[in-house]
């Protein structure tokens, strides 16, 4: 058993060494908008997350997370206002640090993920100021579509070290009222306002 564990440990260290050896000597992403390449990008789901927070009982913010996000971003550095964003969120991916709460949020009293398995945001307008943007669009959640606004910030761009393809990353924030989407359970003990924090990675298609 000890020999097996030792062999596995050595194999793991060797694999790690190979992976590290293949990594670039400097961070590939730079906070330089001039590095953004025009084209259609796909969300890189492993490094894209949508966080949310609500205030619980008036005491403190409580946070959760959505993952497995998919979608596309069309960018043209020569005309940034023409950018198009289309994102789909698997609502069933919702996660909190409390297992029973996570299970409950998927149920009919909350997001009812059996009936409404996904949410979707589609941009309708983009206003760019330097490395920041105001993205207006329609969010469909729980079977209801409402206009919302995202405040986005460019983080970095460059060629991905593994695929060698252009990549770009952004972060964004928004505030929505869940009651607007028919998710009113627990108000006011759990706030109606939901703060959204988005971190998104995109690879050129």
State where each predicted segment sits:
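Bacterial N-terminal signal peptides
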Residues: 7-17
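Positively charged n-region of N-terminal signal peptides that target proteins for export
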Residues: 1-4
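Low-complexity, acidic/polar, glycine-enriched regions of mature
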Residues: 20-205
